[in-house]
Regions:
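Beta-strand/loop-rich accessory regions of lumenal/periplasmic or secreted enzymes
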Residues: 1-286
């Protein structure tokens, strides 16, 4: 078992290249480097790369199912239900270890509700970010969202304007040293559009759209052509690999960027993420 959803197919188009997993790391910013945030919280990069899925539960119309062979060999391709809930329990490899619960609820209208809970433990360092990472097989052509204008972070959104915006360029902000960018706070919905399914060189005539929408509270997201680890490993822009995938992170907590100076001043207290607390949020895929 991969420890997550292995496929999301909509109108014949595959939207997953890898199983969605909890994400705990963003690429360092200049301010993060200046305060040596990676020394204090670098264990979250390892937790982001390697996570242990300890349990999976499948509930169909209120009844617990046996999800492993040979018990699940009774199912055929025409099995249907009014509601299916798939629950994953993860443990981080941090010391001490934290627990993350991710629940997918699929209903007859085709929507997938995603509920995410992080249960912190005393002694863990501050988190850079907490959310779910979805890696798509090909590059998105664009995305549209309802939320705040431009790139926003918890401590960088006072001048943003609420509205509907479209972004056609998924490339990174061209900093001298590649770093985290492209976050959008307080988002009501997001539509990612592609003309490709599994191969960037094979474009279709029909535009395909995957929508993420809020359920209770607005969410934050970034939609980039690289993972945080790929950005982290590049010291100059030209060292980044060719862009081939779409990396969508739907976040429930985001650390601020600071910027008072870049040689020692930390992010202000209200914009930090205490990893000892509980973080919960939800969104829907449709």
């Amino acid at each position: 078992a991969q420890g997550g959803l292995e496929s999301i197919v909509k109108n014949g188009y595959e939207w997953l290249y890898r199983c969605p997993k909890p994400t705990f790391w963003r690429a360092l910013t200049d301010n993060d480097r200046g305060i040596k945030f990676h020394i204090k919280s670098g264990s979250w990069m390892a937790a982001d790369t390697f996570i242990d899925c300890q349990n999976v539960e499948v509930i169909m119309d209120g009844e617990m199912q046996k999800q492993y062979a040979p018990d699940n060999n009774i199912y055929e391709g025409d099995v249907s239900a009014d509601e299916i809930i798939v629950k994953f329990t993860y443990k981080t490899i941090s010391n001490p270890s934290a627990t993350v619960l991710v629940s997918y609820t699929v209903t007859g209208n085709g929507k997938i509700r995603v509920d995410v809970e992080y249960h912190g433990v005393k002694g863990l360092p501050e988190l850079p970010v907490f959310g779910m990472r979805f890696i798509m097989p090909t590059l998105a052509d664009s995305y549209m969202y309802e939320g705040l204008s431009g790139e926003t972070y918890p401590d960088r959104k006072a001048g943003a304007v609420k509205g509907v915006y479209q972004v056609s360029d998924l490339s990174l902000t061209p900093y001298l040293v590649p770093q985290d960018c492209g976050m959008h706070m307080d988002t009501d919905w997001l539509e990612v559009t592609r003309y490709t399914s599994l191969d960037n060189s094979r474009r279709d005539y029909f535009l395909q759209i995957l929508k993420i929408e809020k359920t209770d509270e607005p969410f934050a997201f970034s939609c980039l052509p690289y993972t945080a680890e790929e950005i982290e490993n590049a010291t100059h822009y030209e060292e980044l690999p060719p862009a081939r995938r779409t990396v969508l992170c739907v976040c429930g907590a985001v650390r601020g960027v600071g910027g008072i100076d870049s040689w020692g001043s930390d992010v202000e207290e209200p914009y930090r993420i205490n990893a000892e607390n509980v973080i919960s949020y939800s969104f829907a895929i449709c």
